[in-house]
A protein has these predicted regions:
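Helix-turn-helix DNA-binding helix
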Residues: 151-153
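Ribosome-associated translation termination/rescue signal centered on the conserved GGQ peptidyl-tRNA hydrolysis loop
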Residues: 2-135, 159-161, 171-179
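Generic structural marker for isolated residues within well-ordered, non-membrane alpha-helices
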Residues: 138
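The alpha-helix within a helix-turn-helix
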Residues: 141-142
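DNA major-groove recognition helix of helix-turn-helix
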Residues: 156, 167
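Helix-turn-helix DNA-binding module
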Residues: 145
Length: 179
């Protein structure tokens, strides 16, 4: 069972699908069970343990087939879907303050979260939404999020696709890429 993230009630963009309870998110999703190659030897593909989840309102998908148990693959696919939604779907930010989740995870200007924790997609959403809101200005975004620029970049680098997206958007805006 996937534990709902602490962000359910506290994200600055509460309508973002990566920030709602995973079970509620699944109500807007189509789940498909598929056969994929993976661990388990010659009898592995006799059952459909792979899972593909598609978020219907945004058409964003994620899949998992590494494990031999369909339930574990479902949990992994759901987490990946939330990360994909965090990267590819934007909402507006609360102009006043970062979310309570962000504030709880911040300790002396350092954001403490593992990239595999259930809160990670919601925090990633908030960081990317803030950066987008401040037109890809890392300094302004980090001031809003109450952390240093280097901490914000370090957090984004935990998901390389998010960091690549940031540099792509900065380039489109005529700004230099970040390292």
């Amino acid at each position: 069972m996937v534990r709902p993230p602490d962000s359910v009630k506290s994200h600055s963009g509460p309508n973002h699908p990566a920030c709602i309870d995973p079970e509620l998110l699944l109500k807007d999703c189509q789940i498909q069970h598929v056969r994929r190659s993976g661990p388990g030897g010659q009898h592995r593909n006799k059952v459909e343990t792979g899972v593909v989840i598609k978020h219907l309102p945004t058409n964003i998908t994620a899949e998992a087939s590494e494990k031999r148990q369909q339930g574990r693959n479902r949990s992994m696919a759901l987490f990946r879907l939330r990360v994909n939604l965090a990267i590819d779907h934007r909402t507006t930010v609360d102009p006043e303050n970062p979310s309570l989740l962000w504030q709880r995870r911040l300790s002396n200007g350092t954001l403490k979260v593992n990239s595999e924790h259930d809160d990670f997609p919601a925090l990633l959403t908030e960081a990317i939404d803030a950066i987008t809101h401040f037109q890809f200005d890392i300094k302004q975004s980090s001031q809003y999020l109450k952390c240093s620029s280097s901490q914000l970049l370090k957090f984004l680098k935990k998901e390389p696709r998010a960091f690549t997206l940031l540099n792509q958007k900065r380039s489109e805006a005529g700004l230099h890429p970040l390292r």
